Amino acid sequence: MHALRALDTLCENMEYNFRALEEKWAPIWERDRLFEVDENDSETPRKYVLDMFSYPSGDLHMGHAETYAYGDFIARYWRHRGYNVLHPVGWDSFGLPAENAAIKHGSDPKVWTYRNIDQQARSMRLYAASFDWSRRLHTSDPEYYRWNQWLFLKLYKHGLAYRKKAWVNWDPSDRTVLANEQVLPDGTSERSGALVVKKKLTQWFLRITAYADRLLDDLSMLENNWPERVITMQRNWIGRSEGVSIEFNIPTLKRPVTVFTTRPETIFGVTYLALAFDSEVTEELASKSGVLGELLELRHNIDKTHEGVRGLDLKSFAIHPLTGQSVPIFAASYILSDYAKGAVMSVPGHDTRDERFAVRYNLPIVKIMEDNRLISSGKYSGQSVTQARENITRDLCAKSLGRREISYRLRDWLISRQRYWGTPIPILYDSNGSEIPVEEDDLPVLLPDSEGIDLTPSGLSPLGGIHDWVNLHKAGSLFRRDTDTMDTFFDSSWYFLRYLNPDCDTAPFTLEKAKKWGPVDQYCGGVEHAVLHLLYARFITKFLYDIGFVDFKEPFLRLINQGMVVLNGAKMSKSKGNIVEFSKEVSQHGVDVIRFALIFSGPPEEDIDWKDVSMTGAARFLSRCIQTAKEVPKRTADLSLGDIELRKHTHSLLNDIDWLVDSYRFNVIAARLMDLLNITRKKIQTIGADNPAIREAIETIAIALDMFSPYTAEEMWEILGNKYSVSKALFPEVDTTFLEQKTTCAIVQIDGRLRGRLNVLTNITTEQLVHSARSLPAIEHALSGRSVKRVICVPPKLVNFVVEPK
């Protein structure tokens, strides 16, 4: 024990020399291109592990450190399980931050972007993420965005890309349009934080709504493999609603306005119609009744203030389809023009928003429901809600005043952006303004250099000011290029496929490679992309499936969302001055310590408070790993002579690693490694370091540690005299003879009531558990003469006999 305490003291006093390890191994790994996949290997099973690629806004931050630690953990795990692992790297390098930085500093967004990419690449290499650097890509490279344009043209050819004049979300700060998904619930821009206003512009859209049902239905394929909250968020965003479209005739227009409702049974409670401020019907009615100026002013002010519920009496009436009574029509700020019909039959007696509006504008409030039955509803009074819903729907349809319909919250994807740093839209316009798609042979439509371009946001596309670029003479005719650029979420909607053929110049990727590697087995990134990026990627994948470019319907089989790295409970922010700098932490503590400490801090989905991350403990553990490896003789011995107790601990860990990785309990593996090291070091004092079980334990620790701290693991592997590299080493086979058969208490029930308990092995089968339960005297007596309808068995915890009534 004295020697053990001496070694512990040595480790505690000895500085963990992370810098020497990093300087030793990083250049060797880079020289050997250790993590490039072997495309010629057709025998080894394959896995595709992908981290959400980075935006190059500066150096890496601690959020990147966490994401890459988890993604690399999983990639290395599958290599240790004998898989050929594709783990590529790239940059989402188009976008507003680069353009805004260029405006602020008077620089070129391209120079700013690629300088940051170079900085991040250096940090990533040092961080020892096991990327295949030969597949590196940047979405701002012409070799990449050429295929953005190709994909856009495919969508256009199939009627899924179209241009129309529409009310759009306008960011007055960045002076560009936003997709609905980029507007936060409080009406502000996701990126700039500015209050978003409505503006009518001619824009390009992608018809994602054509895939609404498939996007919704196929979420069932992802259950248990994606976080439930992400599936719920997507399901809610798509927002499928079954209901009825009902026509309310407007005499002054001599035509009806159509409303959509999921509650037709409330039609007798309608006391006013509410129309969206920005609908054409609203403007037409306002014009006829002389309140158009008031409407436009109110709409403008609402865009600026977003205050409460606002409305305007349009001094018009609609005819109730069942009662024939006149119903007043109002413009209301809470009605969205791009959802359902942009018109609502308002029932203030049974809807809180309608009630607030009715109270504010002194409109009637009528109750038409009591104890789940209709009242004051004509011939439908007394019917249950369910009966009335069906009967009213049937009668409206029979009179051609209504029709059954399905509505979606999901809107088509607006991809036009009035900014410079993005993919040019590959469309020309002739002298008549007709759209002409650019020929595929003429791709890419290159983004011109920014020199001489005024990038200051003006509401107009900067590309429009480059006349030599905009105007194109072809075949004796003059054409104009489209001057908008694409939403950068288009770039990231398919990037995972370009990694399969990053150098291919005849296609974005080949079906052969898509079949070989796709879909992505494990995707790692933040939950902030739950609706935007992930929904768009699913849409594009389904389109590519439809046109025969991939043979799978979902892009990402499994998804892990990590929590945030915060400081003192608050989100890190430069403006708050509470940033933890990645480069400073790496310089002070080393890569391995940071990676181990981050993963050890808790389950991936939980936030990590940096103040609680134990660097000292991680450094001490890694130092002990190396020092203990030095104690182990390099010679091999017969494992059958190894200490049985230690081998039980080692094989228990090996047995549990698979399910711990599968359930993302990486922190538990870290704790188990620390336990195994402590047990091994104590065993050295009693059985000696030359016992074969010692070497087996330390080699197992080295292989598992590679998933956390690769520099330390590689050093241990070399010290142990093993063949380079530890990243290629396979986990030892589990010897089940060393696994203890543990017991647990099983509950035995009859019709859900406790009738007995059993002490059983944890690996008991269903048949064994049912047989043992039946053999209990109390159960045997209770079941005597009774018929068992079914048996519910959840080994090793529960047996429930469901019996026929006496």
Swiss-Prot record:
Keyword field contains Lyase: no
Similarity comment: family membership: Belongs to the class-I aminoacyl-tRNA synthetase family.
Entry-linked InterPro entries: aa-tRNA-synth_I_CS, aa-tRNA-synth_Ia, Leu-tRNA-ligase, Leu_tRNA-synth_edit, M/V/L/I-tRNA-synth_anticd-bd, Methionyl/Leucyl_tRNA_Synth, Rossmann-like_a/b/a_fold, tRNAsynth_Ia_anticodon-bd
NCBIfam families to which the protein is assigned, alphabetical: leuS_bact (TIGR00396)
Gene: leuS
Gene Ontology biological-process entries: leucyl-tRNA aminoacylation
Highest taxon listed in the record's lineage: Bacteria
Location of the motif 'KMSKS' region: 571-575
Record protein name field: Leucine--tRNA ligase
Predominant place of localization: cytoplasm
Binding site for ATP: 574
